[in-house]
Curated annotation (Swiss-Prot):
The active site is at residue 124. One of its GO terms (biological process) is DNA repair. InterPro entries: DNA_ligase_AS (IPR018239), DNA_ligase_B (IPR020923), DNA_ligase_CS (IPR033136), DNAligase_adenylation (IPR013839), DNAligase_N (IPR013840), NA-bd_OB-fold (IPR012340), NAD_dep_DNA_ligaseB (IPR050326), NAD_DNA_ligase_OB (IPR004150). Its EC number is 6.5.1.2. The keyword Ligase applies. One of its GO terms (molecular function) is DNA ligase (NAD+) activity. This is DNA ligase B. It is an enzyme of class 6 (ligase). Belongs to the NAD-dependent DNA ligase family. LigB subfamily.
């Protein structure tokens, strides 16, 4: 009963997630968007199957195909078969290719494994599927997967692949094997290198008309021996003896999902001789081959890796003004998972960069993680039929604007508050951008230091600030008064590095105001241009007004 309840909950959660991401389109808009993406994928299919080339990365193709299926389900269309092979394959498979059902996560895999035994895990090698038919000890036929029942005659091509044994003996002398033709790699680390479009490269080599030495760059991983020995260990031993050594090397017995997860993670990070996109868990006990049909395999499932890069829908384009006045563009995304990290926003860069990318809400972009786990845009993989871009704010801001609050200064003003509260400046732990916005919205700050006047009662009654944290926040605000003079000057945005400011030995506001351009220019890392910026900064009316206000608050170094 518990198992069925868990399955029911999983189904309901899955359905809820699908319903939640259905686009808010009119029927006409939905028809147009679905039709455009369908045509593009059909073109990619034709290129892949008929010409053996691919204009799109395998991962992008897979994810956009899934996106198309999602849209079709949302709007009542008939979902397409992913990667539909050509219909002219005429060679019957002795045993049908079943395909493999995908598990959405570890919990789903655990449910599937719970009622099964004698289970084994193998890498899900990323290439193209093939049937190898041996008769009287010789390779008699090689057939592409096709539609699972019929495929193309690949015998001539496969006979040129040195990694495929042309003769076998013993139980394999009259056998049918199913496996994956893959691109041989030396020390391929999936976590670091990704899929490298391996599937398309293999398909390209197999589709070309000319026989090339490049076929020797291919290998084969046998993952099924229909009607073979009952014991998996016997199967693996016979395959290894015949020359299919990789199958034995990369097939391990597993008892539960935790063990599968450990192997999956190991292979994700290990040096392997092929590209993978997950693992396959299979039972050693299989039905007789005459019962095998496409889409009917209940004895094996796949648990794929999260793609290194994910296709994400752009929900909105937002503009942010930094403390220096520079306008940056941020894309809000429909949430995607990257390496266990939920990504909902990605920085595009400057307005000019955004215009070069040509990104609008509704577009599909490829997102990955750069150094230190920071999301980045790799490509725009699909643009919507209807595209409306927001207008960026006027470029009226600079490093000397928005110390005082106003309607037009909202974003730069908040950026200044976030900066001064950071660890390297005044160290106001416990408050970030959301907290500053809540304080400013409630108490309408006059300038960037107005928070010094807030009382414990005001903080406690601020919407968005937890009452349990308001006392701590007031305490930190009070402690900030004792920060060194140089920290307060940094909070005011002086255009100097901390090292240069410390080297100046400035200890009071009056001393700083009387320092000359020549004085600043002598500091380490400070040239004539930076020295002029310091002069402009200290002579700015807003800066002078802030200095006077801090003096009235008896902040160290600002007292008359």
């Amino acid at each position: 009963m518990k198992v069925w309840m868990a399955i029911l909950i999983s189904i309901l959660c899955w359905q809820s997630s699908v319903w939640a991401v259905c686009p808010a389109w009119s029927p006409a808009r939905a028809q147009e968007e679905i039709s455009r993406l369908q045509q593009q994928i059909k073109q990619w299919d034709d290129d892949y199957w008929k010409e053996g080339k691919s204009e799109v990365e395998d991962g992008v193709y897979d994810q956009l195909s899934a996106r198309l299926t999602q849209w079709q389900r949302c709007f009542g269309s008939e979902p397409r078969d992913v990667m539909m092979p050509p219909l002219n394959g005429a060679v019957m498979h002795p045993v049908a290719h079943t395909g493999v059902r995908k598990m959405v996560d570890k919990n789903a895999l655990s449910l599937w494994m719970r009622e099964r035994s004698d289970l084994w895990v193998q890498p899900k090698v990323d290439g193209v599927a093939v049937t190898l038919v041996y008769r009287d000890g010789k390779l008699n036929k090689a057939i592409s997967r096709g539609n699972g029942l019929k495929g193309e005659d690949w015998t001539q091509k496969v006979s040129l692949i040195s990694a495929v044994p042309q003769t076998v003996s013993g139980p394999l002398a009259n056998s049918t094997l199913q496996g994956e033709i893959f691109l041989q790699r030396e020390g391929h680390i999936q976590q670091q290198m990704g899929g490298i479009n391996a599937r398309a490269k293999v398909a390209g080599l197999m589709m070309r008309q000319d026989d090339s030495d490049t076929l020797n760059s291919l290998g084969v991983f046998v993952w099924a021996w229909p009607d073979g020995p009952q014991l998996m260990t016997d199967r693996l031993k016979e395959l290894a003896t015949a020359g299919f050594t990789l199958t034995q090397r990369y097939t391990r017995a597993v008892k539960n999902a935790d063990e599968v997860a450990r192997v999956r993670n190991e292979w994700w990070k290990a040096k392997l001789p092929f590209v993978t996109d997950g693992v396959v868990v299979r039972g050693a006990k299989e039905p007789e081959s005459r019962h095998w049909l496409p889409g009917q395999a209940e004895w094996l499932v796949a648990w794929k890796y999260q793609p290194v890069a994910q296709v994400a829908e752009v929900k909105a384009i937002q503009f942010a003004v930094g403390k220096s006045g520079k306008i940056s563009v941020v894309a809000s995304l429909a949430p995607v998972m990257l390496d266990d990290k939920k990504v909902q926003r990605v920085n595009i860069g400057s307005v000019r960069r955004w215009q070069e990318w040509d990104i609008a809400p509704g577009d599909q972009i490829l997102v990955s993680l750069a150094g230190q786990g920071i999301p980045r845009i790799d490509d725009v993989v699909w643009r919507g039929a209807e595209r409306t871009k927001p207008t960026p704010p006027e470029n009226r801001f600079n490093s000397l604007t928005c110390y005082f609050a106003s309607d037009v200064c909202q974003e730069q003003f908040i950026s200044r508050l976030v900066w001064l509260g950071s660890k390297q400046v005044l160290g106001l732990d416990g408050i970030g951008e959301a907290g500053w916005r809540a304080l400013h919205q409630t108490h309408r700050f006059e300038h960037i230091f107005s928070w010094l006047l807030l009382t414990p009662e005001q903080l406690q009654n601020t919407p968005g600030i937890a009452k349990s944290k308001s006392a701590q926040l007031w305490h930190r605000f009070n402690l900030a008064r004792k920060q060194p003079f140089t920290r307060w000057v940094m909070a005011m945005g002086i255009p100097l590095t901390r090292a240069a400011l410390n080297a100046s030995d400035e200890r009071s506001w009056s001393q700083l105001l009387f320092s000359t351009e020549q004085f600043w220019q002598q500091l380490p890392g400070t040239g004539s241009g930076r020295a002029r910026q310091v002069i402009e900064w200290k002579e700015n009316a807003q800066i002078k007004k802030l200095g006077s206000w801090l003096a009235a608050q008896q902040i160290t170094g600002f007292e008359p």
